[in-house]
């Protein structure tokens, strides 16, 4: 372990969060005792910081804050529980168990995330232990779904080449398992494992992370060209599968992406990962491990908003990182192999894999699986899960793929889809099919404006403009978040809105259609009327003046609405 890393937990400048981690005894803290407390629905701040590593955030229902305050009641505290599934793949049995948990202990809905995870909202403190135990009984886990560790490893879920996809998915699982925290705290606190005195030194207890873990979260994704649905350039560490004739040759390695920033602070910015070389499949785990350890040793532990891997690389330079990585590996990366991305969206409807199995991708608006009066989505999926013999795959765009349907089972699945009116989005605009929003209000404590609850309404209005312009079937990527943390990867969208205040958004234009370019601020702090007034002339002009095959994000740059952003370092210029 490097000298830098040893200093990071003690004498070097560090934030209060670093002290909490260092004193936590490998993520134990006082969580076990806190969960027994029935006086309050909340937990102390130190334990709340540690709870993230265990897969949960404390939240409250912000819609009820004022009313509860008037009644002199504490906020309506609740917990969001995030469930990891590498590559987003789960069995029908696991889907049914998640459905049961959501119905019994959460708010009755399942939220599919932009990192191919499940989120359960509205879990109260005294049900937390049972929820996490039941998640583990389903052979899933919440460990490291949040916190300063490697998060859920993403992987392209919709195969063009089934054999290649399966191989890539296996590597996603291996990376995830390899980078899991080794502490037994999770098993002791949630799964009633008996605590024993651990005489191992810190290197043995957490060989990759050490006692203070990483400076901030770390995200890994694997893309399978021509699809960039995982938004590989948004990842701290991305692997781009290189394959030909159904055979996986290896991966190009991309480093230093990230979406989060802080309003009003130009020292923070989104960034795209840079492709630095090629590795064989057998070298992937070592590259992932060494990259994480470099961030562990050199990431900023004093200022958390400057602690992501993108800043470590930008501060020191990409050549420094390549040299440091190759020194630790003891070998050099190979030259980057050619690759090509065509889009970062999902392929809806039925797709036949090269193994003759079928895959059906449902459009799920903003990832919220629930039953409504006129659309029983959750019930329909439950019926499918009862008879399905393949798998379910959560997509990076918050949709759901019913995977590996045999030709024999396909008619039965189709019948349920039709009976419940489950949609692949074919009747919606292409803009809506390429839309994403984060959860935001009322549960996210960071939200400055609406996102999930508002974007569908805004899209209704934008679709009227699309109809005027004849663009209803034009693929345009649009995203909305309630704050600048970037959960829906808004900085890569052709059109994006980032919440600034209630009903007000910063509007960005010019992201790359395939997720390869950042967008640029176009208008600041505007509401719905201004948004529509700004978009109408641009969309109409695009309809009339676009070149053949020209995407909207490319057009707004060519037409001079915004400048092209080649690097996050230029994002605020």
Swiss-Prot record:
Enzyme class: oxidoreductase
EC number(s) recorded for this UniProt protein: 1.8.1.2
Disulfide bridge partners, by residue number: none
Residues reported to bind [4Fe-4S] cluster: 438, 444, 483, 487
Binding-site residues for siroheme, renumbered to this chain: 487
Cofactor note text: Binds 1 siroheme per subunit. Binds 1 [4Fe-4S] cluster per subunit.
Keyword hit for Oxidoreductase: yes
One MF term in the entry's GO annotations: sulfite reductase (NADPH) activity
Listed pathway(s): Sulfur metabolism; hydrogen sulfide biosynthesis; hydrogen sulfide from sulfite (NADPH route): step 1/1
Catalytic activity, as annotated: hydrogen sulfide + 3 NADP(+) + 3 H2O = sulfite + 3 NADPH + 4 H(+)
Gene3D superfamilies in the cross-refs: Sulfite Reductase Hemoprotein, domain 1 (3.30.413.10)
PANTHER family: SULFITE REDUCTASE [NADPH] SUBUNIT BETA, SULFITE REDUCTASE [NADPH] SUBUNIT BETA-RELATED
Role: Component of the sulfite reductase complex that catalyzes the 6-electron reduction of sulfite to sulfide. This is one of several activities required for the biosynthesis of L-cysteine from sulfate.
Family to which the UniProt record says this protein belongs: Belongs to the nitrite and sulfite reductase 4Fe-4S domain family.
Protein name as it appears in the record: Sulfite reductase [NADPH] hemoprotein beta-component
Protein species of origin: Brevibacillus brevis (strain 47 / JCM 6285 / NBRC 100599)
Gene label: cysI
